[in-house]
Amino acid sequence: MERKVSRIYLASEPNVPYFLQVSWERAIGSGFVITLTDGHSAWTATVSELEISQEADDMAMEKGKYIDELRKALVPGSGAAGTYKFLFSKESQHFSLEKELKDVSFRLGSFNLDKVSNSAEVIRELICYCLDTITEKQAKNEHLQKENERLLRDWNDVQGRFEKCVSAKEALEADLYQRFILVLNEKKTKIRSLHKLLNEVQQLEESTKPERENPCSDKTPEEHGLYDGSTDEESGAPVQAAETLHKDDSIFSSPDVTDIAPSRKRRHRMQKNLGTEPKMAPQELPLQEKERLASSLPQTLKEESTSAENMSLETLRNSSPEDLFD
C-alpha cells in the first residue's frame, strides 16, 4: 500500500497544524483511506470508488479530471500550495476540501470521518511511517551524494584529460604550422627561381630572334644576281644553237668542189659524211634568240637553195658522161 502524509492548516484554526495521511492500493481513483490527526485525537474514513464517481457526477465533471483534482489536493507536492482550503468540524466530524480560484471557491469533496478509539496507536504508526520515510530519504540522499561525488571525480578526470588533449592539439598545430611555413617558403623560393629562369630564357629568345631574321633579309646584290642568272644548261642552249647554225652555214656556204673528176668513193664518202652529221637535241631558246632566228631564217633558206642549185649545176658541168652512167 502506498501512503502520503502532509501537513495542513484548517480554515477555522489557521495556527494549529493537522496531519493528513492518504493511503491507497492501486490508485486514488479506485478508493483510498483518509486519516486526520492533531496529535491528540485521530479521525479516519474510507472512500470507495463509487463515492468518487458520485462526487464527480454531482459536480458535473469528468471522473478522470475529478481524480486529478483530488490527487492535487490530498497528496503533497501535486498541486500549488494555498490553492486548496480544508474544513473540519470536530462536532459533526465532517471533513471537506475546496479549490480557490481568485475570488471564487468551489467544493471538491466532503467526507464523514469516524473518531479512532485508540488514537495513540494511529499516531504511533504515523510517526513510525514518517521516521521510516526520513530514513529512506536520507539513505537515498547519501547514495545520491556518493554518486554525485563519483561523477564529480569523473568530471575532474575528464576535464584534466581534455585539457591535456587541448594542450597536445595546440602544440601539434603549432608544429604543423611551422612546418607548413617552412615548406611554403621553400616552394616560394623555388617558384621565384623558376620564374626568374623563365624570364631569362624569354629575354634570350627575344634577343636572338632579330639575329635569326637578319641573315635571311640582308642578302647582297651579288647573291640576288646569282639567283636571277641562268643556269649552265640554260646558257649552254643558245651557244649550242649558235654553233649548230654556224656549222649549217659553213656547210651550205662552203665553196664548191673544184675536183673535175672525183672518184665514186669520194662522192659516196662525202655524201655519207653529209648524211651522218650528228643530230643535236632540240633545246629551248630564249625569246630574243627565237626572234632573231625567225627573222634570219628566210634569208638563210634562200641562200641555201641558191647554193644547192649552183652546186648541182657545177657538179653536172664537171662530171663526165661515165660518171653519170656509173
Swiss-Prot record:
Family, per entry: Belongs to the XRCC4-XLF family. XRCC4 subfamily.
Effect of residue 312 to A: In 9A mutant; abolished phosphorylation by PRKDC; does not affect ability to repair double-strand breaks (DSBs), possibly because of redundancy with NHEJ1/XLF phosphorylation sites
Modification sites for Phosphoserine: 53, 193, 230, 235, 250, 254, 295-296, 307, 312, 319-320
Effect of residue 53 to A: In 9A mutant; abolished phosphorylation by PRKDC; does not affect ability to repair double-strand breaks (DSBs), possibly because of redundancy with NHEJ1/XLF phosphorylation sites
Sites bearing Phosphotyrosine, chain numbering: 227
Protein name: DNA repair protein XRCC4
Coiled coil regions in record: 131-165, 185-209
Annotated Gene Ontology cellular component terms: chromosome, telomeric region; cytoplasm; DNA-dependent protein kinase-DNA ligase 4 complex; ERCC4-ERCC1 complex; nonhomologous end joining complex; site of double-strand break
